[in-house]
Amino acid sequence: MSKFVFDSMLPKYPQFQPFISSHHLTTTPPNSSSAAVAAALAAAAASASASVSASSSSNNNSSNTIAGSNTSNTNNSSSSPSSSSNNNSNLNLSGGSLSPSHLSQHLGQSPHSPVSSSSPFQQHHPQVQQQHLNHQQQQHLHHQQQQHHHQYSSLSAALQLQQQQHHISKLAAAAVASHGHAHQQLLLTPPSAGNSQAGDSSCSPSPSASGSSSLHRSLNDNSPGSASASASASAASSVAAAAAAAAAAASSSFAIPTSKMYPYVSNHPSSHGGLSGMAGFTGLEDKSCSRYTDTVMNSYQSMSVPASASAQFAQFYQHATAAASAVSAASAGAIGVDSLGNACTQPASGVMPGAGGAGGAGIADLPRYPWMTLTDWMGSPFERVVCGDFNGPNGCPRRRGRQTYTRFQTLELEKEFHFNHYLTRRRRIEIAHALCLTERQIKIWFQNRRMKLKKELRAVKEINEQARRDREEQEKMKAQETMKSAQQNKQVQQQQQQQQQQQQQQQQQHQQQQQQPQDHHSIIAHNPGHLHHSVVGQNDLKLGLGMGVGVGVGGIGPGIGGGLGGNLGMMSALDKSNHDLLKAVSKVNS
């Protein structure tokens, strides 16, 4: 097959490109007339489309090769007439790019042919001119062939670059698939002390390194000889190195650790088995907390990678700066994202300053307590609400479920609140780690607890105020009762005093009455006749009798009946006393 056939097949069948760029197709054999015709036609087409600057720059490069080809053509023409006639036919067919005068001269036969030697019009001067024209035509032909060779070499380099980029994309996809498979195996198989060192193969960029080495081998094997091909090969090698670095960073699950606050807490419970057998990680299963990721924990495993793997890492880090942010975001989304979206975002670079290459010996002095062992809380109603669908039936977000705390968490929070009503940032972080809660939950719990305490104090204050008001009312009632009782006592005392006064008056009257009969007895004892007569006289006067003259004994003169009216008023007042006197007289007489 000829080069022209491959040139026509190149756009449809790019797989024939390595055969076109090989050396045995670029040079045509001198004894093949069809190959010479095809090469001449291809050279003419290439010379018509080539630029002037490219032709001028390549003239100096092709001067030595033209001279060698000229001598070879001369020898061929002298040795074989058929080859010279073939060369002349090539020159005549490719003369479309020359001037018309040259074309008219090229129509003649070669002087070495038998027809031209038998011509009677041939002279010596036209033969020299014909040789000079042949020499120029051969130079131009070789120059066009060299330009055509450069064009095909640049085209082959571009095709090689495209194939290499396709190969790079395939390698990157394979690396990503292997990374996903390795991550699934890491999550499904619990690590142990034995396979922690064997798990370094997941960290090492062996697939990417092998892919990059194969790329460099293919570049060295298929590299063209031109300057443009070497430049494209160097660009392809840089692109391949960058893609291999990105694939290595994506394939290693521990390349770029995400920033977390608590590096000693892991997301997956099975990841504590391998770390507990390492130095400085004894008993980490007591601190198992399902709320935090295992990215930084697994970074301590990557610290124990051997020196050879570290050297393999170092050769890719200089090209991975552009893809580091995207790979870190992808690894953070694929490995460790909190289910609530509120994981700590503080940098973890300053948290573990004493972590060594042998496996984090700086964490050995962390305090561990029995109450740090927590039960699984993933089955709580709060988790079902949070991890479920937030969108309601009308498209609005559902109301977030109420946070439920375990009895242990509530007890520890109450203990802390008993001593401190307000927490510092450091203490809040410690409690959040110990109770497997976030700082926001701790802060909200303390706010609610302070509000609850405020309400309790307000209720106690109201109760005390009510009790005080009750006491005041009772005191008022007691005061009123005492006043009433005092008034009653006063009244009773007044009544008693009145009774006593009455009794005293009665006693005085009785005494007076007793004294009066004694005096009357004494009078009657001395003058009984006089008393008898006075009483009888008084009775007579009281009856209003108009008797004659009464004789008075003891110095009493005779009364006149005319003075009875005046004596009646006095007798009415002395009626009582006289009655008593009559009784006394009757007693005495008896």
Swiss-Prot record:
Top-rank taxon, per record: Eukaryota
InterPro entries in alphabetical order: Abdominal-A, Antp_homeobox, HD, HD_metazoa, Homeobox_CS, Homeodomain-like_sf
Region (Disordered), start-end ranges: 53-154, 187-230, 468-525
GO biological processes: anterior/posterior pattern specification; apoptotic process; cardiac muscle tissue development; cardioblast differentiation; determination of genital disc primordium; dorsal vessel heart proper cell fate commitment; genital disc anterior/posterior pattern formation; genitalia development
Chain intervals with Basic residues compositional bias: 140-151
Any one cellular-component term (Gene Ontology): RNA polymerase II transcription regulator complex
Compositional bias segments (type: Basic and acidic residues): 468-481
Alphabetical keyword list: Developmental protein, DNA-binding, Homeobox, Nucleus
Transmembrane regions listed in the UniProt entry: none
Keyword Nucleus: yes
Single GO molecular function: sequence-specific DNA binding
Entries under SUPFAM superfamilies matching the protein: Homeodomain-like (SSF46689)
Residue ranges of DNA binding: 398-457
Pfam families cross-referenced by the UniProt entry: Abdominal-A, Homeodomain
Location in or out of the cell: Nucleus
Motif residue range(s): Antp-type hexapeptide: 368-373
Bias-annotated ranges (Polar residues): 215-225
Biased composition (Low complexity): 53-101, 109-139, 196-214, 487-517
Cross-referenced SMART domains: HOX
CDD domains, per the entry: homeodomain
Family statement drawn from the similarity comment of this UniProt entry: Belongs to the Antp homeobox family.
Function: Sequence-specific transcription factor which is part of a developmental regulatory system that provides cells with specific positional identities on the anterior-posterior axis. Required for segmental identity of the second through eighth abdominal segments. Once a pattern of abd-A expression is turned on in a given parasegment, it remains on the more posterior parasegment, so that the complex pattern of expression is built up in the successive parasegments.
Protein name: Homeobox protein abdominal-A
Organism name: Drosophila melanogaster (Fruit fly)
Gene this protein is translated from: abd-A
